[in-house]
Each structure stands twice: as structure tokens, then as C-alpha cells.
């Protein structure tokens, strides 16, 4: 096809007409298989009048060359390299220049600097050009090719650092500054000790460049701040001599309310990281006071008139998690304080922080009082030991006072603080039940019907406090149960019922057998939720399954008569509802029931293990992420002949040239795998001999998860494998046989070296 015909097809793809795009895509897939397609694309990327067509042609050419570069004749490769560099020098549209630079980077990954000296010559000439547009093009090209293969430029680091020292001083050219910072971002992890003197010279200019970029383009400035992150993380000490200047710059941006939230949040993230990696230097240089004096006003900032902070709103339409979830500078400033508590000695942090806390808590402003409570909440994590030993009574008194504050925003913060104290200050906090429980119960009763967001905060604090009380919960059990059962009886929202069912689990954990008088009423409500077909009650169903598992462990023997019914309910829901949270809660229920039923669970093991194997094998929730210039994946539909030819090609193309830039995995699916491992391990031990027919297949799938990228899943897989060893040993003792004994020996040997033995070896006869 001539370039004019190809251009018309590309125009069709740019129209807002789905049907025409579909037809044009089908035609284009056919056209692009022809040998003449590549010359036509090259003609368009260099000479088409419409910049959109030039850009599209460059993207398609890059995609084409990505898998076919080695097939081209040497002359054609040299011609293409020359054409692309010429087009790049002539191009005036930024979007096209970027696509041409990315095309150059694709070729560079395959050729390298030695095989493409013209690229290096162009970079050297353009980046030192006296003409600003040409220089900006050179820096754009440099940033893209360095990012594509940074190790190739290590021999040129000194030359590049000298160049960046010049370009970062060009405060009148924002484009130059941005691409210089992008280049520095990529280089930073590869800097060596020899590079340090030149790299340190860039730090003041980096700050100046950021100060120039922020008023012009906050989005670009957010991206450019990655350079600061990388230098902070660098193994060589580049930032340290300029730590004070870097901190001053960050604090100036963070406190500037005239700037947008995005750039202030991004700079607060830099501060969080700075505290993590430079905490000792902060103390040594006495930089903690200015940091705290900047953070506190941000935490205490009032929202715009007539508005509330996200966590203080009571909207069921978009309910936030009980944790600090607002995307505002306030919440990220709290995270900086949290990081300070984690990485500074409390005897250094608390004396400077406590006077500010006391002043805030005495303030007439509810947002000042809220700030004090939020800071107390996060202090309980990093400075937990210090608080337990020296400060718990007075600080808990402050939190309890906050629960009775006239302002709802302060009460919300006090509930959050109490929940954090309950998580982080065990077991000491539980000894204050006489002071805390009456306040929590009074608060629960005061929440108006329908205010589920406030109820969620109360339940968060209640659950965290109650579940560790043990027998100390008994005096409060009648009142607690009346509150929870009332929520279940009333025509309240599904969210309110979900919160009540969750709280019942925490109460059961503490109360154990003392819960028996309330057991029939609880089961009546749970059975109702588990049998409902209402879609809006699905979260309540999931929570009911989780609470049912907790009840099975807490109540124990009295629940045995209901074990078979609970098992059937769980299996039925797994058949009806496709949801990872529902499955993981059901598996936890099965694990709890296995402790009651033992080998009595045998009739259901085939169905249970089948479900669990599907969860262990599932790749659901793993979503490929494509780079920003995806070209409709027009080359995915290649003929089998071409694929076979490519497989036989001696020059195997690099996998990282794919347009898939990474994968995202929804946390729910990792949680499902983690809980599946935990449940199947427990079931194997409790059901003993009955589990043996399923041991091999389950072992194989759990073994594969030792390579899972998610730490918690790997940990759960290791624990499950250990439980399989215990289960097989137990089965051999109760039912000795030659195959069982041999299997136990092999499993034990494999358990001693998971890294070297595979499941096939372990179970081979």
C-alpha cells in the first residue's frame, strides 16, 4: 500500500466512530503484514502534514521494529536509523518528538552505542546547541534513551553530570529542566563513588529547577521530584551535605497553601522518605524542630468553609476506610510524623513534640485538638514502648476526654486514636477497661440511626479494644450484646449490619464461653444473612462467614451440632457468588470447622479442596499494564507462520521491549491466596488421614506459591507446607502403612530444603 492509502487508514482510526475504527483496524492488521508497510510508515513519520499521523506512524513503526529489527537487512537498518534521527531533528511538535525518541530508544536497546555512533553524535551536538529548541530536543532524546538502557551510559556519567550541571541552570527553559531531571532520575541508582563530587554539585541546581517548575506545571514537577527520591535512596552520599537546603525547600512547598494538593502531597511523600533514610542526619543537623513546626499547622489545617475533611464526612455513597484515607496534605503530614516515630529515638522526638501536642489539645479550635489526637494515634506505633512505660495513663486520659468533646471531628479523631492505642499498646491498654468501656458504650448508643460513618469509627475503636480484653469483657457483655443485636434487629443500613456482625466476632474472641447465652440469637441473624439473596447484603454475608468462623473457635463444642449446616452454607455460597473475599472467609470458616469436626469433614473435602485449588492456581485480578503509547495491539494477531519463524530466529528479542510495562494485582486476590494457604494447612492437620488423598495436588500448588511476589503469600505457603508435614506425621501415627511412611520421609526431606526440592520429587514413588 502507498503511504497515501495508509495515511487514510490511520485517519479512520483517529475518528470518534467505533464502527469505522473497528473496520480500519481490521484492514490495517492486514496491510501491515505486507513488506511495503514499513517504508510507508517511515515515509509518514517523516513527512505527513498532520502531526497526529506522524505520531501514529512513529508508534506503529516502533511496534513493528520491536519484534522484527533483526530480520531487516543491514542496509535497511542503517537507512532507518538515519531517517529517524533526521526526522527527530526536523520535528517541531512535542508529541511527535517524544514518539520518535521512543522509537530511537527501541532501536538503541537492540543496537547499543557502539553500533549507532550517529546517535551519540546527535546527543553530543544537540545537547550543547546554542539554540533552545534543538537543545530541548536533545535532552528529550537523552532522557528517553538513558531510561531505556541506563547501564550503557555508565562510562559517560562524568560527561553527562557536567552537562546536567549546565542544563539545570537554564531556569528560563522549563523543558530543559524537566528532561534534565528525568535523566538524573534514571542515572541516580547507577552512580558510583567516583561520580559523587559532580553529582553533589547538582543538588542546589535541582532545588532551583524544582522551584522554577512548580509554578509553571505542578504535574510535571510532581514527576520530576522522582529525581530527589532517587538521590535520597542512592547508595552513595549525594544529598547529605545539602540536607538542610533540601529540607528547607520541601517545607516551603509543603506549607504553601496557594499550591495544589498534588504537589504538596508529593513533597510530603519526599519528606516521609527523607525521614526514613536520613533520620540520624536530621538529628545531627538539628533539623527536627523546623520539620515539626511546619508539619503541625498542616495537620491542624481547617477544611474550606462549609466543608469537612474526607474522614469526617458521613456519606454512605462513598464511605472511606476507617484508616486515614483522605488525599489531602493533612493526612500525608500525619504520615511524616508516623515515620518520625518509627525512625527516631522517642527520647529525642517526644520532648520536642509533646509541648506542641499540649498546646494543640488546649486550643479552642477543634481542628487543633483533632491534630493533637491524630499525632498521638500515630505515635503509638513507632513510640509504643516509650508510651507504655512512661506516658500511657496521661495520654489515654487525653484520648478519653476527646471521646466526650463537643466537636464531632475531635470525637472522630479520638476514636481513631483509641483504635490505634488498642492495636499498638497491648497488653497494658487492656487494664484500663473500667475507664474506656463505659465511654465506648455511651458513644455507641449516642450515634444516630443512619450515621454509619460515625458508627464505623466507633466500631473500629470498640473491636480493637474489646478483642484483647478476655474475661474483663464480662461486666460489659449484656450492654455490648444489646447494642449489637439492636443494630441487627433494627431496619438499619447493610453497612450498619456489617459493622455489628464484625464487632460480634471481636466480642466472641474476648468472651469465649461467656457468649453462650447469646449464641442462639446471634446464629438466627447470621443464618438470615447467609441465606439472603439480596445483592446489597453481600458484604454482610461475607462478614457473617468470617464471624461464624470466629464463633466456631471461640464457642467450641456447643457449636458442633451446627457444624454440618455451617459447612453446607459455606459451600452453597461459594457456588452462588464469585467473590475473592467471600471465598477466603469461607475457607477460614472451613478451617475453624475442621477443628470441631476432624475427620467428620471428610465427605466435603473433595469439594473444599477443589475450590481451594482453583484459588491457589487463579491468575484472576492480575492485570497487565501497557505503556502510554499502546498502538491498539495491532500486531497481536500475527499469523502462525510468522510466529514460528520468529521462534527460530537466532536473535531472540528482549522480553522487556513488550508494551506491557508491568502488572497490577488486586489485593483481594493476594489475600485470597494467603488465607487459602492458612486454611488448607489447618484443615490438613485437623482431618489427618482423610486429607491424604488430596495432599499431593494441594502440596504442588502451595509449593508454587513460594515464588509469589507477595511476602505474606510466601509466608503463608511456608507455614502451610510445615503443617502438611505435621499432618502426614499424624496420619502415619494413627494409620501406619508403607506408602504413608515413605511419603512422610520424602516430605520431611523436602521440608528441610524447600529451595532445592520440588513437589514432584517429594511425592515420587
Positions of the model-derived regions?
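Karyopherin-beta/Importin-beta family HEAT-repeat alpha-solenoid scaffold
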Residues: 1-765
Amino acid at each position: 500500500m502507498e503511504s497515501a492509502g495508509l495515511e487514510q487508514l490511520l485517519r479512520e482510526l483517529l475518528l470518534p466512530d467505533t464502527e469505522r475504527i473497528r473496520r480500519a483496524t481490521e484492514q490495517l492488521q492486514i496491510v501491515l503484514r505486507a513488506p511495503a508497510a514499513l517504508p510507508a510508515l517511515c515515509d509518514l513519520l517523516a513527512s505527513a502534514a498532520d502531526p497526529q499521523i506522524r505520531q501514529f506512524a512513529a508508534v506503529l513503526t516502533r511496534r513493528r521494529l520491536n519484534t522484527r529489527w533483526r530480520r531487516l537487512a543491514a542496509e535497511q537498518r542503517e537507512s532507518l536509523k538515519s531517517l529517524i534521527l533526521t526526522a527527530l531533528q526536523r520535528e517541531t511538535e512535542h508529541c511527535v518528538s517524544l514518539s520518535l525518541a521512543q522509537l530511537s530508544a527501541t532501536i538503541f536497546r537492540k543496537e547499543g552505542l557502539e553500533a549507532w555512533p550517529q546517535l551519540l553524535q546527535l546527543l553530543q551536538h544537540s545537547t550543547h546547541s546554542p539554540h533552545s529548541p534543538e537543545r530541548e530536543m536533545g535532552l528529550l532524546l537523552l532522557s528517553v534513551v538513558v531510561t531505556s538502557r541506563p547501564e550503557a551510559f555508565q562510562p559517560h556519567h562524568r560527561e553527562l553530570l557536567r552537562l546536567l550541571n549546565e542544563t539545570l541552570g537554564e531556569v528560563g527553559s522549563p523543558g530543559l529542566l524537566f528532561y534534565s531531571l528525568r535523566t538524573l532520575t534514571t542515572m541516580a541508582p547507577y552512580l558510583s563513588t567516583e561520580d559523587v563530587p559532580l553529582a553533589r554539585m547538582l543538588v542546589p541546581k535541582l532545588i532551583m529547577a524544582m522551584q522554577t517548575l512548580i509554578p509553571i506545571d505542578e504535574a510535571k514537577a510532581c514527576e520530576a521530584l522522582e529525581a530527589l527520591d532517587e538521590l535520597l535512596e542512592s547508595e552513595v552520599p549525594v544529598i547529605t551535605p545539602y540536607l538542610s537546603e533540601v529540607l528547607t525547600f520541601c517545607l516551603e512547598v509543603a506549607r504553601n497553601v496557594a499550591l495544589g494538593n498534588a504537589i504538596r502531597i508529593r513533597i510530603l511523600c519526599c519528606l516521609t522518605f527523607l525521614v526514613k533514610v536520613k533520620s540520624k542526619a536530621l538529628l545531627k543537623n538539628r533539623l527536627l524542630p523546623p520539620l515539626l513546626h511546619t508539619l503541625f499547622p498542616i495537620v491542624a489545617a481547617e477544611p474550606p468553609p462549609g466543608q469537612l475533611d474526607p474522614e469526617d464526612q458521613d456519606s454512605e455513597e462513598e464511605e472511606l476506610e476507617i484508616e486515614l484515607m483522605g488525599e489531602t496534605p493533612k493526612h500525608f503530614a500525619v504520615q511524616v510524623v508516623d515515620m518520625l516515630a518509627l525512625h527516631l529515638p522517642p527520647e529525642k522526638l517526644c520532648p520536642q513534640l509533646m509541648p506542641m501536642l499540649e498546646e494543640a489539645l488546649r486550643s479552642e479550635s477543634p481542628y487543633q485538638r483533632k491534630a493533637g489526637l491524630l499525632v498521638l494515634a500515630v505515635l503509638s506505633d513507632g513510640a509504643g514502648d516509650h508510651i507504655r512505660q512512661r506516658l500511657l495513663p496521661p495520654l489515654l486520659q487525653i484520648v478519653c476526654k476527646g471521646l466526650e468533646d463537643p466537636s464531632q471531628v475531635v470525637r472522630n479523631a479520638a476514636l481513631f486514636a483509641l483504635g490505634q492505642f488498642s492495636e499498638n499498646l497491648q497488653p497494658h491498654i487492656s487494664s484500663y477497661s473500667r475507664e474506656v468501656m463505659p465511654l465506648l458504650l455511651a458513644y455507641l448508643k449516642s450515634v444516630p440511626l443512619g450515621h454509619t460513618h460515625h458508627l464505623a469509627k466507633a466500631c473500629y475503636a470498640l473491636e480493637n479494644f474489646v478483642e484483647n480484653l478476655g474475661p474483663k469483657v464480662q461486666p460489659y457483655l449484656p450492654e455490648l450484646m444489646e447494642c449489637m443485636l439492636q443494630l441487627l434487629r433494627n431496619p438499619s443500613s447493610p453497612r450498619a449490619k456489617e459493622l455489628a456482625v464484625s464487632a460480634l466476632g471481636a466480642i466472641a474472641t474476648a468472651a469465649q464461653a461467656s457468649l453462650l447465652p447469646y449464641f442462639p440469637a446471634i446464629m438466627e441473624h447470621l443464618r438470615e444473612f447467609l441465606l439472603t439473596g439480596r445483592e446489597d447484603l453481600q458484604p454482610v454475608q461475607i462478614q457473617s462467614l468470617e464471624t461464624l468462623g470466629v464463633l466456631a473457635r471461640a464457642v467450641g463444642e456447643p457449636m458442633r451440632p451446627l457444624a454440618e449446616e455451617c459447612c453446607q452454607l459455606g459451600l452453597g455460597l461459594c457456588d452462588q457468588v464469585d467473590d475473592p473475599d467471600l471465598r477466603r472467609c469461607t475457607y477460614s470458616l472451613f478451617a475453624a470447622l475442621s477443628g470441631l469436626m476432624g475427620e467428620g469433614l471428610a465427605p466435603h473435602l473433595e469439594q473444599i479442596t477443589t475450590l481451594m485449588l482453583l484459588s491457589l492456581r487463579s491468575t484472576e485480578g492480575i492485570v497487565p499494564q501497557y505503556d502510554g503509547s499502546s498502538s491498539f495491539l495491532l500486531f497481536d494477531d500475527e499469523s502462525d507462520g510468522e510466529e514460528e519463524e520468529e521462534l527460530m530466529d537466532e536473535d531472540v528479542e528482549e522480553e522487556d521491549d513488550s508494551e506491557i510495562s508491568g502488572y497490577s494485582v488486586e489485593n483481594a486476590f493476594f489475600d485470597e491466596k494467603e488465607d487459602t494457604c492458612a486454611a488448607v494447612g489447618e484443615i490438613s492437620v485437623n482431618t489427618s488421614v482423610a486429607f491424604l488423598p488430596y495432599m499431593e495436588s494441594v502440596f504442588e500448588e502451595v509449593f508454587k506459591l513460594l515464588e509469589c511476589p507477595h511476602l505474606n503469600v510466601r509466608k503463608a505457603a511456608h507455614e502451610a507446607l510445615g503443617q502438611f508435614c505435621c499432618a502426614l506425621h499424624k496420619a502415619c501415627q494413627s494409620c501406619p502403612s508403607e506408602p504413608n511412611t515413605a511419603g512422610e520421609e520424602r516430605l520431611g526431606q523436602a521440608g528441610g530444603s524447600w529451595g532445592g526440592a520440588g513437589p514432584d520429587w517429594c511425592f515420587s514413588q
